[in-house]
Amino acid sequence: MRISCLLACFCMLALFCACAAPEAALPEPPAAQVQSPEEPPAPVEPPVEPIIEEEPEPALLLSEPVWLLGRLTELYQADETQWAALADVLEAAKTLNADAQLEGLETVQFQGREYIPLAEAAQRLGLEWGEAPDGLRYLARRQTVGQIPEGWNVPVLMYHAVGDEIWGYSDLFVSEAGMEEQLRYLQENGYEPIWFSDLAHIEDYEKPVILTFDDGYDDNYTVLYPLLEKYQTKATIFVIGNAMGSQHKMTQEQVYELAASGLVSIQSHTYTHGNLSAMDEPALRQEMELSNAALAAATGQIPYVLCYPEGKYSHLTMDVAKDYYTFALRMDGWTYQTGMDP
């Protein structure tokens, strides 16, 4: 029995020990690995282009325009230099077949266009400065006429207005059909219409003839000019300087177009069509200088022939005219006489 009690006590003690013993610690799970987010790649910087500083545009100020070989051309000024658009100067130079003369000149950029110093360009092109009656300056070419051989007698055919609408003195008019008939006759019979400048090499022509038209009537542009083109005939038109754009007279633009055609030579019929034989020397010089200035501005060419209005002149007229012209013309009745001393 004692053994039973001991056994019971032992069992209870074992049970107590079992209850009192702490439970064995379970192993902790491994800590979760926290991954940091990947950083985006650094942006690739584009290559930095070197900064090229553009030259600032020159400070050009708009100046008064100038008549450049018959065309009104804008000018800009900086300090003492006047600049014209290179395209305008090149166009003028091409009419002289001298555009190569402008090579190497300094140019500047302004408002999207290229400009060239006008004074230096004019010098290279052999142009002369002057002041037109409208107060603007002009640049024009002086035509050099060679030595005229002596002993030649060249017929000069004188006309005025051409057309079928007669509004003035009828003897001044030739009809359109009549004008064409005469041009056709000259062509079919071997006559060669020339300009006064062609007299320097008159021996090159077998049957030379000069066609002149006085006063610069507007029908010289509307009626005569198409006929000259049709028959490829040269003519000389004597224009009154202050009459351009007036009633029945050609405009300055029409005069320019004729002068640029290669068929028409524009020459002087004085500035006011006054009576030269009654003028003193200052008045004569004013007539001739203003006439030349007006026509030089309109055409880009300085006249070298003078037609005395109504054929009136004096010895003083001839003396003064020699300072401005190579040829002068007067009428004997209805016949023209040429030469500085008719």
Give short role names for the model-derived ranges:
Residues M1-A8:
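Positively charged n-region of N-terminal signal peptides that target proteins for export
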Residues Q267-P282:
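Substrate-binding clefts and substrate-entry loops adjacent to catalytic sites
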Residues E23-W152, L157:
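Primary recognition of N-terminal secretory signal peptides and signal-anchoring hydrophobic helices
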Residues P155-M158, E192-F196, I210-L211, E229-G245, ...:
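Short, well-structured secondary-structure segments
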Residues Q143-T212, Y217-D219, A278-P342:
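C-terminal active-site subregion of NodB/CE4 polysaccharide deacetylases
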Residues E131, F238, H269, R330-M331:
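Short beta-strand and adjacent tight-turn residues that come in two discontinuous sequence segments
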Residues L15-A18:
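C-terminal motif of bacterial Sec signal peptides marking the signal peptidase cleavage site
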Residues Q187, L224-T233, K249-S268, K322, ...:
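Acidic (Asp/Glu)-rich catalytic clusters
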